[in-house]
Amino acid sequence: MGKEKIHINIVVIGHVDSGKSTTTGHLIYKCGGIDKRTIEKFEKEAQEMGKGSFKYAWVLDKLKAERERGITIDIALWKFETSKYYVTIIDAPGHRDFIKNMITGTSQADCAVLIVAAGTGEFEAGISKNGQTREHALLAFTLGVKQLIVGVNKMDSTEPPYSEARYEEIKKEVSSYIKKIGYNPASVAFVPISGWHGDNMLEPSEKMPWFKGWSVERKEGKAEGKCLIDALDAILPPQRPTDKPLRLPLQDVYKIGGIGTVPVGRVETGLLKPGMVVNFAPVNLVTEVKSVEMHHEALTEAMPGDNVGFNVKNVSVKELRRGYVAGDSKNNPPRGAADFTAQVIVLNHPGQIANGYTPVLDCHTAHIACKFSEIKEKCDRRTGKTTETEPKAIKSGDAAIIVLVPSKPLCVESFQEFPPLGRFAVRDMRQTVAVGVIKSVNFKETTSGKVTKAAEKAQKKK
């Protein structure tokens, strides 16, 4: 077997008809986890429904429909391999809760792949003020996805087909607007592709002899290649934050007969080990971890990215809930927030937002109403420079520095220190109206919570 490939996560973004599904479907289809039988079944169904021309997107639609219905489909279907990486597509837009998912995201994307359509009029629609292209790219950047690849899709439908001039025009335009957002175009690979015909997807296309390949420059060195798959191979591997203090937001808490209370969640930073004395914030409950397991196998330690269940002693299911955060009681344990200051970007709110506005925040696994207690300043989104102090109200398109006060105990962190616990979605009227990145947290004075007997024993042993 040799050494296992590194796992990376990508998010595919772009306007609704840019061909994201077809492009993603093509990669999964050609390099992915879908077995031949499933593909043949999909193809047959597609043909019967007269959707023969739609097979790659059809593959994705089938998967998406299953995901929408809440069937946890075989996650392998959303994976594909490059020569260097195992790639997981963590969410493809078009999904209703895409923006929320991207923020509270089960995992941080290492790279965003932006698909823009080259067809006449199509590119312009996607990039116009109300197209989704800008919003998606802005979100990716705001949420710390610093690597970007741009696929200029549907090159087969330009006038004339596979037009170099059209590609160059789009490249120039996209470069200028991703630069406004904060990306450096020199470090972004641009590839002209056809997700449907397969041009420049996995191998260089004869139809675009003018394309000499993409190249990027970044402080980690240069990279170059011919097709989309090479660009994915050139993604810089993520640094998994094992050296930071433990943060594990709880997704669920189970009571398992004969074992006891088992909280479940994903290690975001640090390590979780059996025997560790953990602290659950914001309730400040301290207890010992008896065992840790993943996929029904006992672990000696769980690392960032691992979804685990762990058994805790002398704690009832009622004392823990989704949204609480576990940490190591001996190493900068998590605490509840009295209030926190964040940079908030308003995406789509029909009216004005003023002090006192109290929407629901989705931050990691927590879902809690928070009050905008003080809108301190409006700022330039890209540079962070103040443009107005103490504004009366803010509206769609504005970025502002705001002090928020949670209505119930809540555990959050600054984005700088613990990214997954420092970004949030603001939900109102069943949609994401704003996104935020936490600059600083004013922690509550820790009043000591319950310390279980198991924890006391474990602490004495040490």
Curated annotation (Swiss-Prot):
Residues 70-74 are annotated as: G2. Residues 14-21 are annotated as: G1. It holds the Pfam family GTP-eEF1A_C. GO terms for molecular function: GTP binding; GTPase activity; translation elongation factor activity. GO terms for biological process: translation; translational elongation. Keywords: Cytoplasm, Elongation factor, GTP-binding, Nucleotide-binding, Phosphoprotein, Protein biosynthesis. Residues 5-242 form the tr-type G domain. It is found in: Cytoplasm. It comes from the Eukaryota. Gene3D superfamilies: P-loop containing nucleotide triphosphate hydrolases (3.40.50.300), Translation factors (2.40.30.10). The keyword RNA-binding does not apply. Residues 153-156 are annotated as: G4. PROSITE patterns: G_TR_1, G_TR_2. Signal peptide: none annotated. Residues 194-196 are annotated as: G5. The modification 5-glutamyl glycerylphosphorylethanolamine is found at E301, E374. Residues 91-94 are annotated as: G3. One of its GO terms (cellular component) is eukaryotic translation elongation factor 1 complex. GTP binds at residues 14-21, 91-95, 153-156. NCBIfam families: EF-1_alpha, PRK12317.1. This protein promotes the GTP-dependent binding of aminoacyl-tRNA to the A-site of ribosomes during protein biosynthesis. This is Elongation factor 1-alpha 2. The lineage of its organism: Eukaryota, Metazoa, Ecdysozoa, Arthropoda, Hexapoda. The gene is eEF1alpha2.
